[in-house]
Amino acid sequence: MSNRDITLAYQNVRGLNTKTHEFYKAVSSCDYDVVAITETWIQDGVCDSELFGDSYIVYRRDRDLNALNVSKGGGVLIGVKQNLISNKIDLSNLVTQLPAVDVVGCRMVINGKTIYLFVIYIQPN
């Protein structure tokens, strides 16, 4: 990849379950390199391809609703364009210790430099 700027979009979507088609169209119509989302409210029933197609690698952390005894909420994700080098950061120890904190992280190599991106959502009390 040649040296260039990257574009990043962030949004708190407050639930994607009923907005997957609109979200997919919005992401498809833009050319962001990285998309960071909080409050996805999604679970295993929603596939990454419903949100991003095949042009992004998706790293996500869905909220464990059973562990927190809630019916919805939380969740974070990062979508990284396929042409960027990236991999998920293992945060399983942190997630175990802080189940009410939704966090996902990835490591990217951009223009020869390593960048770490974390998306964190802490629900208000």
Annotate the PLM regions.
Residues 1-125:
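A shared catalytic/ligand-binding motif for oxyanion handling
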